[in-house]
């Protein structure tokens, strides 16, 4: 593995290896830590605002012995129109790796292609691979190693956003059952479904059907960054998909609710449900550190060869 650009690019074995390493690095935190990034500088190139992604990467890089360098696109020449390939070729001669949080998937892929250094997708409009790895890590902590393979996982809300797409690719690679519950116009198009080609991913417009028997129920904001102008015109379609007590009555016994945060209480999730599952949701956020440390360490080891 030379880059992490999407869950799609990974094999099932690579995902399992990253999860195992994430568990190990979390257990070792504060003692017997590896320093695979010692002497290295990693850039965090962000076009979008961030709390969890920025902090978790800065902490993870530092704990692995490296130096994080935060670069907002508004502070570098990318923000003034310099081509990505030029920025990539410059930084590739100066730093050891980069995590990029931006809009278009093609931007991350172009940077990786031209920089020649390990590149991590820290979120695009198409995928959010680091969050999915953190979520899978959290599932294993709650239910046991590899427990996802025997469970149904549900995602309700916008069925065609970066989180739902990354969940679909994880289901494809790992073989668990995934139900996507979303309004008709917010389910993936047929072209994507044909490309995915995965019988264990179920699409439905019925939120109850999606959640029925699910051990893990995921949701996300209805308006992703950059979609704020759509406002009420988009939100009105999603209220039947709100994660609330009534919907969760159809989930499996012992279920958990996941949210990648930030959450808008009273919209995609009710206040009482979020607070009830806060220990899970905020563990999920913490595990961004450990999942990303696993990615960083794996990329550094591959680079050394």
From Swiss-Prot:
Keywords: Arginine metabolism, Cytoplasm, Transferase
Broad class of enzyme this protein falls into: transferase
Binding site for carbamoyl phosphate: 50-53, 77, 101, 128-131, 260-261, 288
Superkingdom in the source lineage: Bacteria
Binding site for L-ornithine: 162, 220, 224-225
Keyword Transferase in annotation: yes
Principal location listed in the UniProt entry: cytoplasm
GO-annotated biological processes: arginine biosynthetic process via ornithine; arginine catabolic process to ornithine; citrulline biosynthetic process
Pathway annotation from the record: Amino-acid degradation; L-arginine degradation via ADI pathway; carbamoyl phosphate from L-arginine: step 2/2
Function: Reversibly catalyzes the transfer of the carbamoyl group from carbamoyl phosphate (CP) to the N(epsilon) atom of ornithine (ORN) to produce L-citrulline.
Protein name: Ornithine carbamoyltransferase
Native source species: Akkermansia muciniphila (strain ATCC BAA-835 / DSM 22959 / JCM 33894 / BCRC 81048 / CCUG 64013 / CIP 107961 / Muc)
Gene name linked to the record: arcB
């Amino acid at each position: 593995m030379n880059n992490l650009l999407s869950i799609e690019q990974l094999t099932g074995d690579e995902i399992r290896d990253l999860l195992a390493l994430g568990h190990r690095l979390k257990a070792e935190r504060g003692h017997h830590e590896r320093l695979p990034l010692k002497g290295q500088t990693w850039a965090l190139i962000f076009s979008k605002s961030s709390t969890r992604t920025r902090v978790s990467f800065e902490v993870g890089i530092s704990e692995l012995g490296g130096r994080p360098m935060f670069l907002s696109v508004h502070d570098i020449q990318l923000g003034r129109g310099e081509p990505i390939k030029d920025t990539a070729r410059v930084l590739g001669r100066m730093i050891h790796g980069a995590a990029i949080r931006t809009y278009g998937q093609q931007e991350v892929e172009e940077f990786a292609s031209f920089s020649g250094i390990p590149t991590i997708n820290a979120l695009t409009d198409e995928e959010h691979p680091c969050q999915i790895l953190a979520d899978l890590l959290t599932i294993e902590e709650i239910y046991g190693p590899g427990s996802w393979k025997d469970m149904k996982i549900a995602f309700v809300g916008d069925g065609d956003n970066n989180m739902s797409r990354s969940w679909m690719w994880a289901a494809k690679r790992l073989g668990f059952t995934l139900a996507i519950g979303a309004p008709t116009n917010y389910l993936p198009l047929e072209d994507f479904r044909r490309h995915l080609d995965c019988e264990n991913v179920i699409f439905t417009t019925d939120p109850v059907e999606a959640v029925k028997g699910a051990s893990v129920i995921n949701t996300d904001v209805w308006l992703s960054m950059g979609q704020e102008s759509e406002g009420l015109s988009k939100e009105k379609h999603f209220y039947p998909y709100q994660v609330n007590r009534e919907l969760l009555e159809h989930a499996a016994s012992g279920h958990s609710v996941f949210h990648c945060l930030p959450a808008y209480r009273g919209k995609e999730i009710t206040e009482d449900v979020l607070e009830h599952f806060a220990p899970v949701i905020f563990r999920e956020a913490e595990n961004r550190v450990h999942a990303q440390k696993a990615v960083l360490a794996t990329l550094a080891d591959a680079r050394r060869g």
